[in-house]
């Protein structure tokens, strides 16, 4: 899935930024991911905007969280450098937000900074640049509760 690929890339990039360094296989993976998102000859607008990576069209539901923001948004484009959200609240240029994308038993958390904003009817279309290292939370089901002494004492009371 696209979200997992972006998560892998941002994690490896974050590892570099922390000064930990990468193993040879991780360096190869970063190179592979960067080449897969390299602009094509048809992506003329990228050179004008200064974007380094191509964004892929997608249809994901996410939650945007920030200062007085906790809204459901639609992620319509995503790439290693950033993403575009539709049905978004107002996000000023430079404002930091968190994008939470749920995928079955995983919850991806990306930090992003507002870059541009366009009026989209009642809501906005927002361009965000990804920053920092993302987090992936694994959801696990706890086993069924087994009655014990505490439960027996509570029932007797």
Feature names for model-found ranges:
Residues 57-98, 125-129:
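Short strand-loop-strand
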Residues 80, 117-122:
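Short, conserved beta-turn/loop elements at beta-strand boundaries and strand-helix junctions
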Residues 102-107:
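Short, charged beta-turn/beta-strand-edge "cap" motif at the junction between a beta-strand
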Residues 120-140:
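C-terminal structural segments of small proteins and small subunits
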Residues 73-74, 109-116:
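Short beta-strand-centered aromatic/proline hotspots
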Residues 46, 95-99, 111-113:
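Short structured motifs
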Residues 1-78, 133-157:
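N-terminal helix initiation/capping motif
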């Amino acid at each position: 899935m696209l979200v997992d690929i972006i998560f892998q890339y941002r994690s490896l990039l974050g590892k570099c930024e922390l000064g930990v360094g990468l193993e040879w296989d991780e360096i190869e993976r970063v190179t592979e991911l960067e080449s897969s998102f390299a602009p094509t000859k048809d992506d003329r607008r990228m050179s004008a905007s200064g974007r380094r990576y191509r964004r892929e069209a997608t249809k994901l539901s996410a939650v945007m969280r920030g200062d007085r923001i906790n809204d459901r948004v639609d992620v319509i484009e995503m790439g290693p450098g950033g993403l575009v959200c539709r049905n978004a609240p107002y996000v000023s240029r430079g404002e930091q937000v968190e994008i939470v994308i749920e995928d079955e038993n995983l919850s991806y958390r990306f930090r992003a900074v507002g870059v541009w904003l366009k009026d989209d009817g009642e809501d906005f279309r927002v361009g965000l640049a990804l920053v920092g290292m993302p987090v992936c939370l694994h959801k696990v089901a706890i086993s069924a509760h087994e009655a014990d002494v505490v439960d027996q004492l509570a029932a007797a009371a």
